[in-house]
């Protein structure tokens, strides 16, 4: 490892010789300065300085003045302030000046070493620790994985995998990343078997303790919050994966405390017209078709499939005996989000305000269709990064800040996630087969039954049955459906895109977050 060069500025340098020798013995080169002006000259002349130890109380330029000038010369240069003063305003000024650390005299050499390691070696040490810790956890997760896990155990496994993915994002050395990807793929293989074995049983009352699903979410989780709140906002961010929630969580936590973080399971297909309509209606698709034929549209029907979400919600609330004043808004672009954020005061008179945010879903589709977005979100870390960038500059964050100031409780959830698809599964169908790449429904489907979850009788899964011989098939793991005609072109176009509609951890295990204002 290369030696780091440290500039130490202090007007009592003679007294610090033992400390300098100690640093030399630990592998640091130390350049000294006895004033702020001398320190600035050295910074100007020597681009090889890696960090500065800066005394706060020096004759001439003070430490704080020197700090400001160093940052003008080299904003990236870490400065560790050393001072006798414990006055709070000096600490505040130093922190405001973007110091890397703050040490109170008298300092012992080990304190300085610790501060330098924290400042200069943080990323390397964190990276090494991340890889070491994941190696330990790898075996534990591997032993846990099987299709015999309970729903709650699958939630724990998925949380661990996402945790390590986000830790690997921060690590410089990604030596264990390929191992993590393989373990996630194995988890998805087992999760597919779990869903295949249990999904229909959950819906048909054959499991005494089924997980909360799209159509039971509001009744099981949200209505109790609504009952005890004067005013509450339900924010449904379409297509928000659990990992995407975890990266925007720290930003939200500046304004809100996470009261409860839960994961629920999306119904199949994990597509907006099915999952989000189920969420708002409290009904499965075949039940919506039967009870509300004027609002429900099947895959073959023309027109928008999510045009009656507010109607579905009103009907569910009525069934549950909840007569509340509510608003419903759907945001599909920046201008719409900005306009809604500006009207928060008008919404405060409602007990319930529902906001559907479509951006993340649009990003997923744009990632497929637009070359520039494909390059910006080439893989999952990049996809998370672009989500974070959107959120930090979105009207949604502005709205959340306003709601926090008004002390309003909010719930953030989603309808389904999305998965990064890589491998094609061949399927044949007639001209009426739907276009989704992760599920197909039709009367003349030809496929390899080992590569899909097939629902031969849609009624078993409470899905619409458009023809006597209709069936549904769902893609597993990271697969996507492709037709034999023009197969190679189709595969090249859709491989490495983000799709939803099928069965994977990322699509089905999704966040439901209750937040209270700070």
Ranges and model annotations:
Residues 65, 86-101:
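Alpha4 helix (beta4-alpha4-beta5 surface) of REC/receiver domains from two-component response regulators
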Residues 11-12, 21-22, 57, 92, ...:
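Feature captures the catalytic ectodomains and active-site-proximal regions of enzymes
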Residues 47-53:
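Active-site beta3 strand of CheY-like receiver
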Residues 34-38, 62-65:
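Acidic catalytic/metal-coordinating carboxylates
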Residues 55, 83:
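Active-site residues of response regulator receiver
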Residues 41, 64-75:
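Short amphipathic alpha-helix used as the core "switch/output" element in two-component signaling
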Residues 105:
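A Lys-centered signature of the CheY-like receiver
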Residues 13-31:
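Two-component/phosphorelay signaling modules centered on CheY-like receiver
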